[in-house]
Design a protein with these regions (language model features):
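Active-site region of the double-stranded beta-helix
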Residues: 1-99, 113-209, 217-218
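Glycine-rich, small/acidic residue-mixed loop/short-helix segments
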Residues: 221
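Short secondary-structure transition/capping segments
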Residues: 106-108, 150-151
Length: 224
């Protein structure tokens, strides 16, 4: 990206690369968190906000996520629980997962990865995360991780339900559109042989779940 800049990304010269992509393996439950939108993050953090999506690559039996606030729970309910140091997990929807499930979390939606899950994460290029609950865990010195109660209450939107999709097990077409949201689109490409990707106005990021060869006019590259 530093070398080729806008010729590679299709973005205006000097523009920050807008996405982060990660592989996350969770042995145990991660902290419950929420991210601000661009407007709040700009004012309070001088940074971008964050929306993100998860593609479940592997899930142990019984694995689950925390994904959005339960129906009927209000921001006042959350405020009482958070300021009172109560366990907020009963206020959050727990969703079972399996390999191939896709979850989108817009800014303001509470979420947490459960244990026994390997996932692929696509997100806006931002490190702004507000931790609202960490299950009262302590480190070796008996210290709890810091929480961001007021910031979380500022940005949580209990009405958000996110978007869900599933990677096709037996795709009837080469390209399956999974998500199309303001920050990114997410497609699943499955081909028995060669697949020609249509032209795009900006960059693509290809992540190979199985070995493949990427070919273009000037050469080719093995993805493993």
């Amino acid at each position: 990206i530093e070398r080729y800049g806008s010729r590679l990304t299709g973005l205006p010269e000097g523009a920050e690369f807008p996405l982060l992509l990660k592989l996350l393996a969770a042995r145990g439950s991660l902290s419950v968190q929420v991210h601000p939108d661009d407007e709040y993050a700009k004012v309070h953090e001088n940074k971008l906000g964050k929306t993100e999506a998860w593609v479940i690559l592997h899930a142990e039996e019984g694995a689950s996520l925390l994904y959005g606030i339960r129906e009927g729970v209000t921001i006042d309910d959350l405020r009482r629980a958070l300021t009172g140091g109560e366990d907020v997990e009963p206020l959050i929807q727990r969703v079972p997962v399996k390999a191939g499930d896709v979850f989108y979390m817009p800014a303001g939606m509470v979420h947490a990865i459960g244990g026994g899950i390997l996932l692929y994460e696509i997100q806006q290029s931002s490190d702004v995360t507000y931790r609202l609950w960490d299950f009262n865990r302590v480190n070796a010195r008996g210290e709890k991780r810091p929480l961001h109660i007021q910031q979380s209450l500022d940005v949580i939107r209990p009405e958000l339900k996110g978007l869900r999709a599933h990677m096709p097990e037996h795709p009837a077409q080469e390209i399956t559109h999974l998500l199309d949201v303001p920050a990114f689109t997410l497609d699943c490409v499955a081909a028995d042989g060669a697949c020609i990707l249509p032209a795009a106005e900006t960059f693509r990021v290809l992540t190979a779940l199985e070995p493949l060869t990427l070919r273009w006019l000037e050469g080719e590259m093995e993805l493993k």
